[in-house]
Amino acid sequence: MNELTQTPPVADGNEPPFTRPGLVETWRERVSYQALSLGLVCALVAVALLLGNQLTHQRIVDAERQDRLAVLRQVLPQALYDNDPLADAFNVEDAELGLIEVYPARRAGQLTATAFQISTVGYGGPIVQFIALDSEGRILGVRVLSHKETPGLADKIEVTRSDWIKAFDGLSLASTPLDQWAVKKDGGQFDQFAGATITPRAIVKGVLRALEFQARQSTAQSNQETRP
């Protein structure tokens, strides 16, 4: 008697793919691998973005520091200090001016001059300026750190384009009457610009504020020293 032998059915390609032996496991492994790869790529991208932001932020901070240092060197004579005014800077909250950045210049431990960073409102927005005063309240120099004034009309506030801002050098509250701290159009002694009166007004206002702030600080210190 011949025994009948049965051969296993051969897949004809019409079976559902997930019913084939081993394909389910292979599919699961692929999905897990792809998910892991995607997660790894996302993590690497996040790290790269974070490092890039940190490097960019540091470059911006360094550039701002260099800008401040360059301006400070223009208004504070090197002979007046042996400290680092940038490193020794501090903020003061003033009732009239708000927050003021103060950069003290010292030589042999003694305060010889002070630079103030003050912001006033011009025609195009804030005008940030440095005003340096010696210990007697005389102006050592005034420079604009940043502004958004109209190009061409307000260029004179930049020392690289005009000597207008040097007109403040050597002045003080003691040497210049209060009513003269204005542009000529307003009865003061400082030139205005053709078509841009608001800009020089803002500069003069900032300088006067710095002078008055130092005067208030000096008066307060003197009162403390004379108290029993």
From Swiss-Prot:
InterPro entries: FMN-bd, Ion_transpt_RnfG/RsxG. The modification FMN phosphoryl threonine is found at T197. The chain crosses the membrane at residues 35-55. It is a single-pass membrane protein. One of its GO terms (cellular component) is plasma membrane. Its cofactor is FMN. Its EC number is 7.-.-.-. It is an enzyme of class 7 (translocase). Keywords: Cell inner membrane, Cell membrane, Electron transport, Flavoprotein, FMN, Membrane, Phosphoprotein, Translocase, Transmembrane, Transmembrane helix, Transport. One of its GO terms (biological process) is electron transport chain. It is found in: Cell inner membrane. Pfam families: FMN_bind. It comes from the Bacteria. GO terms for molecular function: electron transfer activity; FMN binding. Belongs to the RnfG family. PANTHER family: ION-TRANSLOCATING OXIDOREDUCTASE COMPLEX SUBUNIT G. Part of a membrane-bound complex that couples electron transfer with translocation of ions across the membrane. The complex is composed of six subunits: RnfA, RnfB, RnfC, RnfD, RnfE and RnfG. NCBIfam families: PRK01908.1 (NF002519), rnfG (TIGR01947). This is Ion-translocating oxidoreductase complex subunit G. It comes from Stutzerimonas stutzeri (Pseudomonas stutzeri).
